[in-house]
């Protein structure tokens, strides 16, 4: 079985430099796809319900303090990372195909509208630290259900209007800079990813 570090390094090899928020979410959704299709996780590490969405503590420890990272950043010692099997790569490749063009904040908002993250954060305020684990059972149960409107789990990976609306709803033009509209994405309180 792959580790989350193996998956993260593969994502970075395929994408180049990405935000750590985006990396966390792509790893989360790759694992969710494996759970839905095989009833097994892609890797043994778990995710916690942090302020800005699901975060693997093991992966966070590797990129802590950095906003953008690239290939070789997660495991500078190549012996730490093992190549993924073709089967394991298929989950990551499909996740990247459907969600790879999204920014980290868009993926964060997507996860906020989904039960695994929001249920795990029950009892926590919007900006409270939360270390509650998002269970694999909750992940598989939600993403395999009809309630899920995540484009990765819809036939053909097509966006529907509810997802499009949710991803763009929080964007607003608040001012102009040098005569051009300045688009502002609301800041999420807290320092967590």
Feature names for model-found ranges:
Residues 1-193:
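Domain-edge interaction signal
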């Amino acid at each position: 079985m792959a580790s989350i570090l193996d998956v993260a390094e593969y994502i970075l090899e395929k994408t180049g430099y990405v935000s750590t928020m985006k990396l966390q979410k792509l790893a989360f959704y790759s694992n969710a796809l494996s759970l839905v299709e095989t009833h097994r996780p892609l890797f043994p590490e778990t995710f916690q319900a942090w302020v800005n969405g699901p975060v693997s503590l093991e992966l966070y420890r590797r990129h802590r303090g950095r906003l953008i990272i690239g290939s070789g950043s997660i495991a500078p010692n190549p012996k730490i990372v093992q190549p993924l099997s073709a089967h394991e790569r298929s989950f990551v490749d499909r996740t990247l195909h459907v969600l790879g063009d999204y920014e980290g904040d868009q993926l964060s908002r997507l996860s906020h509208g989904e039960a695994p993250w929001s249920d795990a954060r029950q009892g926590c305020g919007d900006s409270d630290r939360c270390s509650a684990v998002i269970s694999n059972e909750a992940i598989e149960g939600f993403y395999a259900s009809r309630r899920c409107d995540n484009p990765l789990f819809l036939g053909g990976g097509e966006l529907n209007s509810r997802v499009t609306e949710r991803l763009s709803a929080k964007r607003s033009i608040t001012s102009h800079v040098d005569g051009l509209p300045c688009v502002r994405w609301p800041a999420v309180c807290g320092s967590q990813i």
